[in-house]
Amino acid sequence: MASVSALTEELDSITSELHAVEIQIQELTERQEELIQKKKVLTKKIKQCLEDSDAGASNEYDSSPAAWNKEDFPWSGKVKDVLQNVFKLQKFRPLQLETINVTMAGKEVFLVMPTGGGKGLCYQLPALCSDGFTLVICPLISLMEDQLMVLKQLGISATMLNASSSKEHVKWVHAEMVNKNSELKLIYVTPEKIAKSKMFMSRLEKAYEARRFTRIAVDEVHCCSQWGHDFRPDYKALGILKRQFPNASLIGLTATATNHVLTDAQKILCIEKCFTFTASFNRPNLYYEVRQKPSNTEDFIEDIVKLINGRYKGQSGIIYCFSQKDSEQVTVSLRNLGIHAGAYHANLEPEDKTTVHRKWSANEIQVVVATVAFGMGIDKPDVRFVIHHSMSKSMENYYQESGRAGRDDMKADCILYYGFGDIFRISSMVVMENVGQQKLYEMVSYCQNISKCRRLLMAQHFDEVWNSEACNKMCDNCCKDSAFERKNITEYCRDLIKILKQAEELNEKLTPLKLIDSWMGKGAAKLRVAGVVAPTLPREDLEKIIAHFLIQQYLKEDYSFTAYATISYLKIGPKANLLNNEAHAITMQVTKSTQNSFRVESSQTCHSEQGDKKMEEKNSGNFQKKAANMLQQSGSKNTGAKKRKIDDA
């Protein structure tokens, strides 16, 4: 009869092999998901091509984009003349001519084009080539003001109506809408105007009857759909326009929309058949990078200042912040260290916003430190860097905000600082949104990924097929020459669940910070669990592990609402039950090391030349002197943003 020790040894061997098999299953499952995603995208494209082919056989014009990329339509001569003599442009960008031809033919079209691709021209130019006026629906007054400023410089007659418009101005616009001799070509309104102003709708009817109202342009059309990243209820009322004015052609524009969102928007706008032109999401001149956000504020500012004084010396940029308070504090810190910076957020007085915008456009200010209120319609071509002080609330938002860099098609950098605490600051803000948390976790997954091409991650989100080799080492992950492996972190999850169960029994709620403290053997003694050994990993890597468990649903967020704030707590998630199976394994990708280590690399740029480093070192001298005084006054130690190599417990 076999001895107990021999049986135990065999059992351990089987358990070990089961863990290895579980890890292989997870790797294969990930690969399966990638292939399923590619299959879905390709199937949709084939279906779209077949539908376009069928539609082309029965329509007056072929519905494939290539068929509309022509200059032999009745309006083509006028279109070219307006392009060159009014807009002062010599040629169209990709999909602009196709979209213009479709809308000039009186057909409905949706255009999905990256930020900076020139969507505005696709309805502004046709407005000048058509009789009557085009009604433009925009979500933000600031966006309308930006566009009107540019149109005025080009000598194009355009105006807007909003709640602050004077009675005299409203009266003039209403008269121009039905005046057959009017030169007014573009009228900008917010969706609220359509939803709530019966007087304006009445005026539109009269203009339509007089054949003066010829086209509807819905900017940021993704706002129609509750599945979009920026859903606005008043956009749902826009369906009335096609019902009331069926002969006015409609063009919808967005930089960020999935197929699901576009289909939903089409239904909401009451469009039966619609062309959809989608430009590639790829901006080949943009370099994407994710950096570990230093926990120390002084370290963080040091990192940013070294970049601005080094690689971006004398170059224009934007720093996006989570809140108005962050925007103002970062601006003050940068100014104290000699950077010409200006804050921009929604609560600034209109004249202050205009001043900051004007000075930045004229390069009198090097950096705008802004909230998301800054950017829509911003058309500064030479923005060399966009830095995210905190991550965006969704992939769509990040794509749009980072896309404000490099509109001149020259190389530009998009650097995102990822910090654990930001997850919960943002989740508390988006908790009431329909898919807010889901979209945030997609963004967290993007930031946590240390190996996949950033463009591949974006492509998967926007339903595109992408070959990582086409990135040309224009993202941090594609620049790495490290090897990666999957580490088994199952026991960490079991320990965290023990801590959360004990807290639940004590009727205690644990914030993410309290959970980490308890795990590390710190904080209140009653929240610690006997038998849970504190891991020897640094705190920032424990944060990454908890974030991994959160987006994999082994943990979940719960919220408490107070009069002043929404507080996020962590609880046991729906997938935690899988741990009842002893063989179940949870793995996390880490950088492979020759030693038995758990190493999470902070991303480093690879595209910049050696001169960048020298420039940063050269220009950091003044910074160090100024920073030393600031740090001495605050009594804080400047430890620097370090790359860490972590020994696995």
Curated annotation (Swiss-Prot):
Record-linked SMART domains: DEXDc, HELICc
GO molecular function: 3'-5' DNA helicase activity; ATP binding; ATP hydrolysis activity; DNA binding; double-stranded DNA helicase activity; four-way junction helicase activity; metal ion binding
Biased composition (Polar residues): 597-608, 630-639
Chief subcellular location: nucleus
Keywords: Acetylation, ATP-binding, DNA-binding, Helicase, Hydrolase, Isomerase, Metal-binding, Nucleotide-binding, Nucleus, Phosphoprotein, Zinc
Biased composition range(s): Basic residues: 640-649
Matches recorded under Gene3D superfamilies: P-loop containing nucleotide triphosphate hydrolases, Winged helix-like DNA-binding domain superfamily/Winged helix DNA-binding domain
Binding, Zn(2+): 453, 471, 475, 478
A Pfam family matched in the record: Helicase_C
Keyword Membrane included in the entry's annotation: no
Positions of post-translational Phosphoserine modification: 597, 602, 634
One GO CC term, this protein: chromosome
Domain of life per record: Eukaryota
Subcellular location(s) of the protein: Nucleus
Cofactor binding note: Binds 1 Zn(2+) per monomer.
Residues modified to N6-acetyllysine: 514, 522
Bias-annotated ranges (Basic and acidic residues): 609-619
EC number: 5.6.2.4
Chain sites annotated for binding ATP: 113-120
Ranges where the record places region Disordered: 597-649
Names of required cofactors: Mg(2+); Mn(2+); Zn(2+)
Residues in Helicase C-terminal domain copies: 300-451
Family: Belongs to the helicase family. RecQ subfamily.
Protein name, UniProt field: ATP-dependent DNA helicase Q1
UniProt source species: Pongo abelii (Sumatran orangutan)
